[in-house]
UniProtKB/Swiss-Prot annotation:
Main location as per UniProt: membrane
EC annotation from Swiss-Prot or TrEMBL: 7.6.2.-
GO biological process: lipoprotein localization to membrane
Residues at which ATP binds: G42, S43, S44, G45, S46, G47, K48, S49
The protein, known as: Lipoprotein-releasing system ATP-binding protein LolD
Organism of provenance: Pseudoalteromonas translucida (strain TAC 125)
Oligomer status and interactors: The complex is composed of two ATP-binding proteins (LolD) and two transmembrane proteins (LolC and LolE).
Any one GO molecular-function label of the UniProt entry: ATP hydrolysis activity
Family: Belongs to the ABC transporter superfamily. Lipoprotein translocase (TC 3.A.1.125) family.
Keywords: ATP-binding, Cell inner membrane, Cell membrane, Membrane, Nucleotide-binding, Translocase, Transport
Pfam family, one: ABC_tran
GO cellular component, one term: plasma membrane
Domain of life: Bacteria
């Protein structure tokens, strides 16, 4: 049996709004095996991004347990959380957040340089990952010379170059047209199969969500999980 990459039990998140308390997550239970994929869908303000931030150690739950790779992340210090993120997690956002003054390969190599790899080793690994996302031939181009879909592929390569166990993606195709969005989801499926990386993807698009293995519906702070009808 595969190891659990995510294990959440009775996760609750409450925000204070003046004199009122707003419950965003209510008793969320979630388990994801290494190599599985999950789409999280729900209306605006349903708590999708909040849940993603808790999984990514960027926020903490009010109560309950959230374990990533069997580690209770809330119990780590901020320094330990940063090291944990760098080792185990990759992040993809709606906007690529690439550094515009650097080339594609330099952007992808950045997380490896932060981890302490030599410039040569980081570049080799970055080129290999750009090859996997079909952009090795554009490695020397800066983001301004790339299309929107290409920029997001570079962002995906950057998220995966450290070989994380889990990639968290917040509306990764929200800034793309439908055709390019489908290509990005197909790429995520391909990378999931070839690298055995788990993906949790927040999206508002049910059609795209159905391309992943499981769909989690967040409604009024409660999570319901269903198997996707799509076989990639």
């Amino acid at each position: 049996m595969n190891d659990l990459v995510i294990s959440c039990e009775n996760l609750n998140k409450v925000y204070q709004d003046g004199s009122n308390q707003v419950a965003v997550l209510k008793g969320v239970d979630l388990a994801l095996q290494q190599g599985e994929m999950l789409a999280i869908v729900g209306s605006s303000g349903s708590g999708k991004s909040t849940l993603l931030h808790i999984l990514g150690t960027l926020d903490t739950a009010t109560s309950g347990s959230a374990k990533i790779k069997n580690q209770e992340v809330a119990k780590l210090s901020r320094t330990e959380q940063a090291a944990f993120r760098n080792k185990n997690l990759g992040f993809i956002y709606q906007f690529h957040h690439l550094l515009m003054e650097f080339s594609a390969v330099e952007n992808v190599a950045m997380p490896l340089l932060i981890k302490g790899l030599s410039a040569k080793a980081a570049k080799v690994a970055a080129l290999e990952m750009l090859e996997k996302v079909g952009l090795a031939h554009r490695s020397s181009h800066k983001p301004s010379a790339l299309s929107g879909g290409e920029r997001q592929r570079v962002a995906i390569a950057r998220a995966l170059v450290t070989k994380p166990a889990l990639v968290l993606a917040d509306e990764p195709t929200g800034n793309l047209d439908k055709q390019n969005a489908i290509k990005i989801y197909d790429l995520i499926n391909e990378l999931n199969k070839s690298l055995n990386t788990s993906f949790v993807v927040v999206t508002h698009d049910l059609e795209l969500a159905d391309k992943l293995g499981k769909i989690a519906y967040l409604d009024d702070g409660k999570l319901t999980i269903k198997e996707s009808q799509h076989v990639a």
